[in-house]
Amino acid sequence: MNLVVYLIQLFLAALLHLSAVKAAHIPKEGGKSKNDVIPFMDVYKKSACKTRELLVDIIQEYPDEIEHTYIPSCVVLMRCAGCCNDEALECVPTETRNVTMEVLRVKQRVSQHNFQLSFTEHTKCECRPKAEVKAKKENHCEPCSERRKRLYVQDPLTCKCSCKFTQMQCKSRQLELNERTCRCEKPR
């Protein structure tokens, strides 16, 4: 009896997966022949940064769940995708929401049952500077000293270098701060 229920659930899951694949397919508009040229504005609008239905692998969202198999193995989620007008920008979510979906969770030869998983869906998208571009702009200062980096702190806005140790820290050890070398030294 359990095998029959499992086979029915497997069939329904496969059917759901196939319908999701069909829904994710972008159909040709108006029965155009394969030699028609798609106008620029159509191409531009379809490629813009926006939320779209995407198939997302469950294991991608839950990488630590390797001892289980999920049916279906992927789900349809609204996610940000598309192109930005500048290569330094990327399409990223600005608003999200959680959605809970019921899937079949199978542990090989042990158990199977319906299981609820929570996923993040994107509701709004924007083109924003890529993370590596931000990092390059933020770190525009030359290092204080190649040989003694650990002795200095640097103001990221002004790039001004100052000693990591303070006069008070040096005095607490009966030493004086040498501001040229940024080291605590014995008084002369």
Curated annotation (Swiss-Prot):
One of its GO terms (cellular component) is extracellular region. Disulfide bonds join C49-C91, C80-C125, C84-C127. One of its GO terms (biological process) is induction of positive chemotaxis. It is found in: Secreted. Glycans are attached at N98. Predominantly expressed in regions associated with active vascularization. From 15-16 hours post-fertilization (hpf), expressed in the anterior forebrain, the mesoderm underlying and lateral to the anterior hindbrain, the mesoderm underlying and lateral to the posterior hindbrain, and in the ventral medial portions of the somites. By 30-36 hpf, expression in the somites is decreased, while strong expression is observed in the region of the developing glomeruli and in the anterior portion of the pronephric ducts, the pharyngeal arches, and the brain. The keyword Signal applies. PROSITE patterns: PDGF_1, PDGF_2. Residues 1-23 form the signal peptide. Disruption phenotype: Morpholino knockdowns show a complete loss of intersegmental vessels throughout the tail at 28 hpf. One of its GO terms (molecular function) is chemoattractant activity. Keywords: Angiogenesis, Developmental protein, Differentiation, Disulfide bond, Glycoprotein, Growth factor, Mitogen, Secreted, Signal. PANTHER family: VASCULAR ENDOTHELIAL GROWTH FACTOR, VASCULAR ENDOTHELIAL GROWTH FACTOR A, LONG FORM. Belongs to the PDGF/VEGF growth factor family. Growth factor active in angiogenesis, vasculogenesis and endothelial cell growth. Induces endothelial cell proliferation, promotes cell migration, inhibits apoptosis, and induces permeabilization of blood vessels. Required for intersegmental vessel development in the tail during embryogenesis. Acts both upstream of kdr and tie1 to stimulate endothelial cell differentiation, and upstream of gata1 to stimulate hematopoietic cell differentiation. Homodimer; disulfide-linked. Isoform VEGF165 binds kdr and kdrl. This is Vascular endothelial growth factor A-A. The gene is vegfaa.
